[in-house]
Every structure is written in structure tokens, then in C-alpha cells.
């Protein structure tokens, strides 16, 4: 195989015929029904001809990255093109909040000595979701969440988004949920409570470090086969957050309390 292919991807392809359930992590991103891989790539120049030649699905990210779905039969030929710098397979991610608190210099008792409250900024939480009804994310009966992208929701053209994944709830929709006038499908719950905890520590109305910031929430999607949150959902969330900050011309901070090492 080409040397720009992730070694885990090489191993997965070479051992797939001997697959067993204990190695599910290795095959994250592979669809046995379609014999395709969902992958993260880094590339140079225009690759639209490769998209057509290898019948790929592609979503272009910022800074020369993209997420593709490609048939395994075409992978080596695609990787051999000099415009393809690197190909990485998705990996699972796990909840990790304790080290994030340590790295942020947050102890059990936090005192804000700087007079900074996040006013005028956006705080993005890419995690397990959020309890959007919690009073830490509501002020004067209105949601402080600018948007909530539930990657695990069923995608519908009625509520189309550029990623063709999940459902993005607007601030107006969240407000109508709070006042009881919303008649649509509700966002999925934060069953683990991890994202809600992270958001409250960082930006809760009453207890947060930045109580005046507005929130952008992404609930990370899961791999179809393993049901595990993956790096692809994480990367899409980062892309969405950065694009939102650029579009609104506002500074944005991104919290990632998920990881895999």
C-alpha cells in the first residue's frame, strides 16, 4: 500500500477477512454492505476529478482537509495520486473531563479575578449533547444556545444542512421548545450528562467561568456498526464551529473533552 495511508487502515484492510467482534475498533468507518470506507484526507490542489473518477462522496473541510466515502477497491489508486497527502481512518473517542479541568487551571473552588465573562464571544462544546432546558443555559426564559447540532438525529431534507448529517436546531427553535410552542421532533437527550457538565463548568449562567458567552453545541455522531463516537464527528464539529465563528465575525472558543489517548 501507499505510505500515505494510516497504518491502522492498512491493518484493517489486510485482516478484514478474519474479523472478530473483539476488533470492532479497527473497522470503524467501514461499511460491509457497500464495501466502502469513510475516511479523513489531507490534500493539495483541486481533486474534483478524483471524486468523479473514483465515485466518491466528499465533504470539503477547511484548511485542505476533507471527509470522503470511497470504495475499498479504489483506495490504493486514489492514495497514489500525488495530490493526496495523507489518509486517516476514523477512531473512537471517549469522554475525558478531569484532565481538561486540570489543563485549564480549574480547581474545586474557582474565583474569577480578571473581570472576564465571555460577553460577545461564542463557546462551542463538542461532546455528548446538552440538557438544553437546564437553567444554567437559559436567561430570562430564553436559550443561550445559538445552535445545537445533533449529529445522531435522522437527517431530513426538510431541515437540510451542508453536512447532510443529523439535525441543526436554531436558537429560535430552542426558544419555542422552552415556551412549549414547538411541535417538531425534540433534540436527543444528553444521556451521560457529560456534555451538560462540561458546558456548565465553562459557561453556566450561575456557576460558569464565562456566564455571558453564547453557546454552540454539537452532539457527536456515532459509527454505524460500533455505535461509538468517532473522530470524524469530532472533526465535523470543529469545522462547523469555526465556520460559524467566521460567519458571525465573533471570537469562538472550542472545548473538546473527548479523546482517545
Regions found by a protein language model. Give the residues of each.
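Autoinhibitory N-terminal propeptides
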Residues: 1-63, 76-112, 135, 223
Amino acid at each position: 500500500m501507499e505510505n500515505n495511508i494510516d497504518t491502522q487502515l492498512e491493518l484493517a484492510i489486510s485482516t478484514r477477512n478474519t474479523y472478530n467482534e473483539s476488533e470492532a475498533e479497527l473497522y470503524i468507518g467501514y461499511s460491509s454492505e457497500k464495501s466502502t470506507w469513510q475516511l479523513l484526507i489531507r490534500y493539495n490542489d483541486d481533486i474534483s476529478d478524483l471524486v468523479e473518477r473514483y465515485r466518491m462522496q466528499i465533504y470539503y473541510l477547511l484548511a485542505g482537509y476533507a471527509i470522503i466515502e470511497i470504495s475499498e477497491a479504489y483506495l490504493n489508486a486514489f492514495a497514489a495520486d500525488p495530490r493526496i497527502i495523507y489518509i486517516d481512518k476514523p477512531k473512537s473517542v471517549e469522554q475525558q473531563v478531569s484532565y481538561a479541568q486540570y489543563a485549564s487551571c480549574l480547581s474545586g473552588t474557582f474565583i474569577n479575578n480578571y473581570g472576564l465573562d465571555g460577553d460577545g464571544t461564542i463557546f462551542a462544546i463538542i461532546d455528548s449533547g446538552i440538557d438544553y432546558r437546564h437553567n444554567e443555559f437559559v436567561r430570562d426564559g430564553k436559550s443561550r444556545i445559538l445552535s445545537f447540532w445533533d449529529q445522531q438525529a435522522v437527517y431530513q431534507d426538510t431541515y437540510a444542512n451542508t453536512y447532510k448529517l443529523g439535525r441543526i436546531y436554531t436558537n429560535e427553535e430552542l426558544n419555542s421548545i422552552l415556551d412549549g410552542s414547538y411541535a417538531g421532533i425534540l433534540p436527543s437527550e444528553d444521556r451521560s450528562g457529560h456534555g451538560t457538565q462540561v458546558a456548565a463548568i465553562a459557561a453556566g449562567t450561575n456557576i460558569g467561568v464565562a456566564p455571558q458567552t453564547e453557546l454552540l453545541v454539537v452532539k457527536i455522531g456515532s459509527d454505524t456498526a460500533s455505535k461509538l463516537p468517532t473522530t470524524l464527528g469530532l472533526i465535523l464539529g470543529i469545522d462547523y464551529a469555526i465556520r460559524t465563528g467566521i460567519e458571525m465575525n465573533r471570537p469562538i472558543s472550542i472545548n473538546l473533552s473527548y479523546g482517545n489517548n
